[in-house]
């Protein structure tokens, strides 16, 4: 597929550092050329520049009328106002319509759900409506977007990256039919060395092994030599949205941020955990790395397996077996319901992830606990949290104490005053970096997945997650959240008011560009 070419084995590769340098230099030359032409037009071609200004005005009107967040459009308005030629050229290169031409469109809807699966989902929704009527709306909302509701699924909450990754590697070692991995980051190191040996051994045994990873997330961390080794033994590797040196083919946005692992159809994992040493605290980055995820065993695993297959097929992959081969084969009996779902920019402006979050916030009556590494809310999300706080809901927002990006943290902190004013408790996880993405409501519903509470996750990146209703794992999640609070510092209004003058000056400026963080 154009814009998403799969690099073939034997293709000449260069080191990550040289590759980055080449891309940066070529981009600088191209952007410099654009700026030079713009100023030439401005100084010497008044008539042409007037035409450009009129064109910029029409483009601004077009952008305003497109669906989407006004905060995103505001950046383009400012750019078109300050430098019309540059703004127009950048929009046509990197604006919404230009970049979306290169997105996988899910035009190949393999695998199609048989009527029996849809019927079981409808039966599950009816049962959920009787048991937990407050959550039937969310379940129906996702079902209408083709994300089925499952029973007969054991959902295990995994409160640490090290626990999840050890569990995953042990399961991969037992695989008999297939192993599917889709990750934003696959980083070479101790964890990868162990996993690679198992993957190669399984491929030699005839197990179907497929890997999807995002090129931008791995440009310095996953070498061409590693890809060659995998392909030599039969592992199929697909590179999502390769970083390109030409500006019209370079996509800063629309990355594959999902974390999905599927083994033999019966087991699937998702959450915030990538495959890299820092996620298991083998190496230290930003203090203690606190992450989490879930393991699905049973019917619900199919929701994540099907999502992987759709992405793989849209990247040019071929599924070597019939549909039923990839479905769960081992029956499981368990309490509660689960509903895996995915999100991506092709859905805009209908974004399941943000819509689900808003429904969870508005549905809270007693407790609303949230963990997220990045908090850059839009107006609707911010308003919903404030309404929940004003309504007497115990709202707790848990964020990193040692953030990885100071500018994103600065933007998040700018919202604290308003949240605290409306009764929301904001906590900073003091041991280090809190990377888990989870929501718990009233001890009856929960979300765990890859979705951050920011514009990038809601609008620009491919994401995934699982809604869980009435399952025992919710208590495990609550226990972990209580532990996080015990190891966190409550942010007070007085402390927030004492932040530095420099930080206060930068906050409104950074908010303008928050959508690209």
Which residues fall in each region the model found?
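Active-site donor-binding acidic/aromatic loop of nucleotide-activated sugar
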Residues: 426-430
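N-terminal localization/anchoring segments of enzymes in phospholipid and broader phosphate metabolism
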Residues: 1-355, 359, 363, 403, ...
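Catalytic-core elements of nucleic-acid end-processing and repair enzymes
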Residues: 437
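Histidine/acidic-residue-rich catalytic or RNA/ligand-binding cores of hydrolases
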Residues: 380-382, 409-411, 441-444
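Helical hairpin unit composed of two closely spaced alpha helices linked by a short loop
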Residues: 374-396, 400, 405-407
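Short, glycine-rich nucleotide/cofactor-binding loops
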Residues: 185-190, 371-378
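Internal, well-ordered alpha-helical scaffold/interface segments
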Residues: 362, 383-386, 413-417
């Amino acid at each position: 597929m154009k814009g998403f070419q799969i690099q073939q084995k034997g293709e000449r590769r260069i080191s990550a550092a040289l590759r980055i340098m080449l891309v940066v230099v070529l981009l600088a030359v191209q952007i410099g050329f654009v700026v030079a032409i713009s100023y030439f037009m401005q100084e010497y071609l008044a008539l042409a520049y007037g035409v450009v200004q009129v064109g910029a005005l029409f483009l601004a009107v077009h952008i305003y009328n497109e669906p989407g967040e006004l905060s995103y459009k505001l950046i383009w308005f400012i750019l078109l106002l300050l430098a019309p030629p540059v703004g127009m050229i950048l929009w046509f290169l990197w604006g919404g319509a230009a970049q979306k031409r290169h997105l996988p469109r899910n035009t190949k809807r393999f695998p199609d759900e048989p009527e029996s699966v849809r019927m079981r989902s409808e039966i599950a929704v009816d049962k959920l409506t009787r048991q937990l009527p407050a959550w039937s709306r969310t379940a129906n909302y996702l079902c209408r977007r083709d994300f089925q509701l499952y029973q007969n699924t054991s959902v295990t909450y995994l409160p640490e990256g090290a626990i999840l990754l050890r569990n995953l590697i042990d399961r991969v070692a037992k695989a008999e039919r297939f192993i599917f991995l889709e990750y934003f980051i696959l980083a070479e190191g101790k964890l990868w060395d162990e996993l690679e040996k198992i993957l190669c051994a399984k491929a030699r045994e005839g197990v179907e092994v497929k890997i999807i990873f995002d090129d931008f997330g791995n440009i310095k961390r996953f070498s061409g030599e590693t890809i060659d080794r995998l392909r030599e033994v039969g592992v199929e590797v697909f590179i999502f949205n390769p970083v390109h040196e030409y500006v019209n083919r370079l996509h800063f946005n629309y990355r594959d941020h999902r974390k999905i692992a599927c083994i033999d159809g019966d087991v699937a994992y998702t959450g915030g955990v990538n495959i890299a040493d820092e996620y298991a605290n083998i190496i230290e980055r930003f203090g203690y790395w606190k992450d989490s995820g879930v393991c699905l065993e049973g019917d619900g695993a199919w929701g994540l397996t099907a999502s992987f297959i759709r992405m793989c097929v849209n990247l040019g992959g071929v599924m070597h077996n019939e549909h039923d081969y990839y479905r769960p084969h081992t029956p499981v009996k368990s309490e509660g319901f689960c509903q895996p779902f995915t999100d991506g920019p092709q859905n805009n402006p209908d974004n399941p992830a943000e819509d689900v979050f808003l429904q969870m916030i508005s549905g809270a009556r007693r407790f609303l606990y949230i963990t997220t590494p990045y908090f850059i809310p839009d107006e609707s999300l911010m308003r919903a949290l404030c309404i929940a706080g004003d309504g007497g809901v115990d709202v707790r927002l848990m964020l990193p104490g040692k953030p990885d990006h100071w500018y994103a943290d600065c933007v998040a902190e700018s919202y604290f005053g308003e949240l605290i004013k409306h009764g929301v408790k904001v906590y900073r996880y003091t041991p280090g970096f809190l990377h888990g993405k989870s929501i718990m409501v009233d001890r009856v519903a929960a979300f765990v997945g890859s979705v951050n509470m920011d514009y990038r996750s809601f609008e620009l990146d491919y994401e995934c997650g699982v809604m869980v209703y009435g399952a025992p794992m919710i208590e495990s999640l609550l226990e972990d959240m209580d532990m996080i609070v015990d190891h966190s510092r409550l942010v007070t209004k007085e402390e927030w008011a004492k932040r530095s003058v420099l930080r206060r000056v930068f906050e409104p400026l950074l908010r303008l560009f928050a959508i690209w963080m």
